[in-house]
Amino acid sequence: MELIYHSANVLLATIKDVLPIIGVILFFQLVVIRKKIENLGRLVYGSLLVVIGLAIFLVGLEEGLFPLGEAMSRQLTNFHFLAKGNASLLEKIEKTGIIDPNLYFWTYIFAFLIGFSTTIAEPALIAVALKAKEVSTGAISFWGLRIAVAIGVAIGISLGCYRIISGTPLHWYIVVGYVVVICQTYFAPKMIIPLAYDLGGVTTSTVTVPLVAALGIGLASNIPGRSVIIDAFGLI
C-alpha cells in the first residue's frame, strides 16, 4: 500500500515537471507559429506514455537501482571479503582501518563492467548514435560509436572508484582529463570533434547515473576515512 501511495505521488510530481515543457511547445505552436497541431491524438497519447514511463522509471530507481548499487558497494568493500580468509590481514584491517587500494580489484572490475553495460543501454546515446550514422550516411558506425563511448565511461568510472578508495584529490583527475581532451581535440578529425563533445553530455543519463551515483555513495559510506559529501560525488 505504501508503494502504491508513493508511486501516485511520483506520478503527480512527474506531471508537474512535464507541464512546463508542454506549455512552451503549445505557446510556440499556437501563438508564435499559429498553426494547428497535427496528429493531436497521437501526440497526447505519446505524452501520456512519457509521463507514465518517467514515473515508473523514477519509482524503479528508488526501489531497485539505488539500493542495488549501494548493496554491491557494501559487499565489495566488506573487510571479510577483502581479506579472502586471510586471518592476519583481516585482523590488521580491523585494527588499523587502513586497506591497500589494490585489494579492491573486484570493485574496479565491477565499476568497469557496470559502466560499460549501462552506457551501452543508455537511450540518449542510442539516439545520438542513430542520428550520427544517419547524417554521415554510414561513415560513423552505430555500434562502433556506442562501444567506444562505453569503454571510455567504464575506464572513467573505474578511475573514479580508485580515487574514492585511495583518497586522491579530485582536481588531479580533472586537470589531467582536460589536458588529454584538449590534446585529442587538436589531433582528432574535425568531423568527430562536435559529436564527441555532445556524446560527453548525453552518455551519463537515465540508466548510468542512478547506478554510478549509488556506487559512489556506497563506497564513500563503507570505506574508513571517507566523507559521503566530499568523496562520493565526482564519478559522473
Report each predicted region and the residues it spans.
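A generic, lipid-embedded transmembrane alpha helix
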Residues: G46-P67, G152-I155
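Transmembrane alpha-helix boundary signature
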Residues: I56-M72, A83-E94, I120-P123, G167
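Helix-loop-helix junctions within the multi-pass membrane cores of secondary transporters/permeases
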Residues: N86-A87, L103-Q184
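The first (N-terminal) embedded transmembrane alpha-helix
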Residues: I15-F28, A214-G216
